[in-house]
Amino acid sequence: MSIKGTKTEQNLLKSFAGESQARSRYTFFASVAKKEGFEQIAGVFMETAEQEKEHAKRFFKFLEGGMVEITASYPAGVIGTTAENLKAAAEGENEEWSDLYPEFAKVAEEEGFTAIAAVFRNIAKVEAEHEARYRTLLARVEAGKVFERDEVILWQCRNCGFVYEGKTAPKACPACAHPQAYIEEKKNNY
């Protein structure tokens, strides 16, 4: 069944455009975070930007070519501080997972595109995770807790991998001397 001329086709293009724009905004936000001394947050913005690219690609691949006219609204041109950018990013992710994609999934389902509906629902789950991550980072920035915790944890240098144990990240890496901006909470993903 062709999606040409359907509401689902329009929703896919809106989603492609939204994800593509989010990717660009997140790369801009990463530059600000880096300048403000938040290498980890810059890394999170870049990682999320790449994930948004994959979402855009997934939506784009459902389209069947030609010109499609859409009417949509997107965030326009404000790059703020890292805290402001985290807040804006969290709000955008919230709108996607709680409003847009569930509605787009419903429409796709009604139009008989169950596979597309499932993709909208699954990407909505990812966007909820993005929002949660941005809100956690925002809370840490606002509380001055990016490089400090209430309990002893393991910190790791993003540059050389040195691991340090303490409540506060060292001001500079004891191994490679990179500044505190490169220190983050150690995560095991193996």
Describe the role of every protein-language-model region.
Residues 1-190:
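Non-heme di-metal
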